């Protein structure tokens, strides 16, 4: 479940493919704008926030389509996305990622940092994990969080934005299945 191939499939399936149709398209990013707006407002919908997020997500879709929609059909398949990650991200640090990936990673952090304190603690990590997978025991999630965090992370009270960016970059750019970044999104399942 922690192979590079499965991790990239996981990103497509659980982070971008909001409408669950098996590929990425403009609709996914329109849905992401609504999701991010509601999360940022903790359930309240701000028309101004939505307008901003809709523009950000439209730009993000355009950049991702430019990087990954190789056959220009308005859809990015899992294979196209993997090729784009391989070409643009694999073996690179966050600072060297295309802007589209950087923006998405920053937005992802904001949606996980529910209390807005600039840190993702174990409680927020748990909430993030249960939005994508089913767990019979919270210990499974807590064990993944312990594997993810370094002693410095634990002393700081969690993962800050810079650390999250570094971990996300390792998640999609590093093939090492033992890398602690493999646990960024919780215990992973094999993606079909």
Swiss-Prot record:
Annotated keywords: Acetylation, Calcium, Metal-binding, Muscle protein, Repeat
Coiled-coil ranges per UniProt: none
Binding annotation for Ca(2+) 1: 17, 19, 21, 28
Location of N-acetylalanine modifications: 1
Domain spans labelled EF-hand: 4-39, 56-91, 100-135, 136-171
UniProt key word 4Fe-4S: no
Pfam families registered for this protein in UniProt: EF-hand_5 (PF13202), EF-hand_7 (PF13499)
Keyword Cell inner membrane: no
InterPro entries: EF-hand-dom_pair, EF_Hand_1_Ca_BS, EF_hand_dom
Top-rank lineage group of the source organism: Eukaryota
Annotated function: Like parvalbumins, SCPs seem to be more abundant in fast contracting muscles, but no functional relationship can be established from this distribution.
Subunit structure: SCPs from crayfish, lobster, and shrimp are polymorphic dimers; three isotypes (alpha-alpha, alpha-beta, and beta-beta) have been identified.
Other known facts: The sarcoplasmic calcium-binding proteins are abundant in the muscle of arthropods, mollusks, annelids, and protochordates. This protein has three functional calcium-binding sites; potential site 4 has lost affinity for calcium.
Name of the protein this chain belongs to: Sarcoplasmic calcium-binding protein, beta chain
């Amino acid at each position: 479940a922690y192979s590079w191939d499965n991790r990239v499939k996981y990103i497509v399936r659980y982070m971008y493919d909001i409408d669950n149709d098996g590929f990425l398209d403009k609709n996914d990013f329109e849905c992401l704008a609504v999701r991010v707006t509601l999360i940022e407002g903790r359930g309240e919908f701000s028309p101004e926030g939505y307008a901003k997020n809709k523009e950000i997500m439209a730009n993000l879709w355009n950049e991702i389509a430019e990087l990954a929609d190789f056959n220009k059909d308005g859809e990015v398949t899992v294979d196209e996305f993997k090729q784009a990650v391989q070409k643009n991200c694999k073996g690179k640090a966050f600072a060297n990622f295309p802007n589209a990936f950087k923006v998405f990673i920053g937005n992802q952090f904001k949606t996980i940092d529910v209390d807005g304190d600039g840190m993702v603690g174990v409680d927020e990590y748990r909430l993030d994990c249960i939005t994508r997978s089913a767990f019979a025991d919270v210990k499974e999630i807590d064990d993944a969080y312990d594997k993810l965090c370094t002693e410095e992370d634990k002393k700081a009270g969690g993962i800050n934005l810079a650390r999250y960016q570094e971990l996300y970059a390792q998640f999609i750019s590093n093939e090492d299945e033992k890398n602690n970044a493999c646990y960024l999104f919780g215990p992973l399942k094999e993606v079909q």
